[in-house]
Amino acid sequence: GKICLSDDINALMNEANVGAEKMYQAGLQCIRRNSATGKYYFIENSSDRKIEDWIPLRTEARSAAIFNPMTGASGLAAMKRNDGQTDVYLELNPGETVIVSTSGQHFTGDAYAYYQNAGEPNPVSGSWTVSFVQGGPQLPASITVDSLGSWTDFVGDEYKSFSGTAVYTTTINKAPVADVIKLDLGSVAENASVYLNGDYIGTVIDSPYQLYIPAEKFKGQDELVVRVANSMANRIAYM
């Protein structure tokens, strides 16, 4: 071993053969740990733009796998070797995170699902019924609205002071035109669980509030339910 002294942190890192990860130049941040067969990367998109690109990892690998801790999606990453490093293709919205596992061994399994937009966004049109199912200080009356929005914008103090859970329900009459449909809920305060025709699709608790739904779950006339729970801020303000 040896002790190195310098005022230049980059020089010290180079001397110790600890190289910087180039992904930081793309607006990504990571925590890197060694594993028995390779490395683990916890990667966050800390920029304000979506990342859809090949991202270099400072490691040599034969295989790489991606796991999304928020959605549970996982699979083998698209990757390529490049001059002693490994490039992995990532799609990350601002604030989104994934875990990438690299290995000198050959992984087998399903490929990680990457998505490309098949066309322009198609808004969910029609009315929504909003029912308040749990919370207080009292349960407001159900209401029908023309578009999704915060219940604090509804007319009436009972809506503005309500903290709890409300269920937004609508009917979709358009058949999907792609293999997978991305449902973008926009801004949610604070979390939302989505059901299609009674089937649980998933829960979102942070931005981006998006879920991917296989086209085969749609029947042509579909009931979409969004169960939203907010924080206690409204009720505290009421008190």
Name the predicted role of every residue range:
Residues 172, 176-192, 224-226:
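A short beta-strand element within beta-rich, extracytoplasmic domains
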Residues 1-165, 173-180, 199-204, 212-214, ...:
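Carbohydrate-binding surfaces of carbohydrate-active enzymes
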Residues 232-239:
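Edge beta-strands of jelly-roll/beta-sandwich modules across compartments, strongly enriched
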Residues 160, 186, 237:
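Flexible, active-site-adjacent loop/turn segments at secondary-structure boundaries
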